Every structure is written in C-alpha cells, then in structure tokens.
Amino acid sequence: MFIIGLTGGIASGKSTVAGILKDLGAIIIDTDRVAREVVAPGRPAYREIVAAFGPRVLRPDGQLDRPALARIIFNDATARELLNAITHPRIRELVQKRLEDLRRANPEAIVVIEAPLLFEAGMEGMVDAVWAVTAPAPVRLKRLMARDKLSLAEAESRLRAQGEETARLRRATRVIPTGGDLEATRASVRAAWQELQRHLADDPEPGGAPWV
C-alpha cells in the first residue's frame, strides 16, 4: 500500500484535488470527516471540548456548533492549541486504524490522507509522500468568502491563523497548484498520479525510490 498525505492551507483546493485522485483510483481518508466522528456527542473529545469552551459552542440539539467554535479558535491561538490538543491524538488514532484495515483488505491500494494540518497533527510519519496543494492568497480569500459566507476581514483572519505556507511547501515531495482553472488542476494531478504509477511499477517499495 502506498500512502499520500494531501495537505494545504484553508481554501487551497485540497478537496478538489482529493476528488480528482478518487476518480483516478485512490482511496480517500478525509480527516475532516474523521474529526466529526471524534467530536460526536458522547465521545471523550466532545466532553472535553464542552468542558473547555462551555455551552457557547453547542447547538440547541447538542451537536457542536462548528462555526461558533471556528470563530473562537481562529481568533485565539491559545484556544486553537487547546482544541488541537484534544482532537489531534484521537484523529491520528482513528486514521491509523483505518490504514490498518485498508492494508489488510487492499494491500495494493493507493491511499490519500486529506489533512490540512498533516504536519501540525503529527501525521507525516504515516505517509510515504506529501503532496501540498497551493493557490495564491487572493484566490484563497475569494474562495473562503464564497464558501463560508465570511467577510473579507474574517477570511483574512483565518488565513493568518494558519500562518505562512512556505514551510509546508518546502516539506512536500510534490506541490500541486490550483490557482488556475479546473482543467489545469486536473492536468497537474494527472501528471503527478502518472509519475507515481511509473515509480510504483519500477519499484513498489516506498523506501527504494525518490517518491513524488
């Protein structure tokens, strides 16, 4: 099994790239969905979040109010670190279990872990290659405002909270730009996929080739 860590800043186009990779045959583990499982009512992380942040992060039905929680953590680094400390270990644990299940069921699979905080969550050791998705800041701002119905100031605050992406790009084995149109993104992803397929055909052991 070959595992790709797909990462990138907020509104960089990760989900679009993951969708293209799924169409090409990859199995996707979406850590945002994993996180939703981790913080479901009744789970330990849910109880810790409510204890830490109080009823202001709950909806009337008892579910976490994710937009309310996002407003808090994107404007408070200490709160963000606290939330990450609660959720990241549990997300890692569940992702590792999914990988073990997949390895038994489909040892020849190419698996993509879609994780915006791949490095911050300590998951880089799980993967054979890191593909980083990137787009210019103005493009990301426009996407974020449209997607999450944010003001310009709110969108800028969320981009700032994630910090510079230079370090992330430097640690990646492949960078996929998404600032152009969708067909250009598809072409970049297909090229990366085809190169990976060639490497796997030549040497199926990740440690034996310069993985991309």
Swiss-Prot record:
SUPFAM superfamilies: P-loop containing nucleoside triphosphate hydrolases
Taxonomic superkingdom: Bacteria
Binding site for ATP: 11-16
Coiled coil: none
EC numbers, comma separated: 2.7.1.24
Any Gene Ontology biological process: coenzyme A biosynthetic process
GO cellular component terms attached to this protein's record: cytoplasm
PROSITE patterns linked: DPCK (PS51219)
One Pfam family matching this protein: CoaE
Residues in DPCK domain copies: 3-207
The reaction(s) this protein catalyses: 3'-dephospho-CoA + ATP = ADP + CoA + H(+)
Places the protein is found: Cytoplasm
Subcellular location, principal: cytoplasm
Gene Ontology molecular function, alphabetical: ATP binding; dephospho-CoA kinase activity
Sorted UniProt keywords: ATP-binding, Coenzyme A biosynthesis, Cytoplasm, Kinase, Nucleotide-binding, Transferase
Gene3D superfamilies: P-loop containing nucleotide triphosphate hydrolases
Pathway: Cofactor biosynthesis; coenzyme A biosynthesis; CoA from (R)-pantothenate: step 5/5
EC category: transferase
Record-linked PANTHER family: BIFUNCTIONAL COENZYME A SYNTHASE-RELATED, DEPHOSPHO-COA KINASE-RELATED
Family named by the database record: Belongs to the CoaE family.
Function: Catalyzes the phosphorylation of the 3'-hydroxyl group of dephosphocoenzyme A to form coenzyme A.
Name used for this protein in its record: Dephospho-CoA kinase
Organism: Moorella thermoacetica (strain ATCC 39073 / JCM 9320)
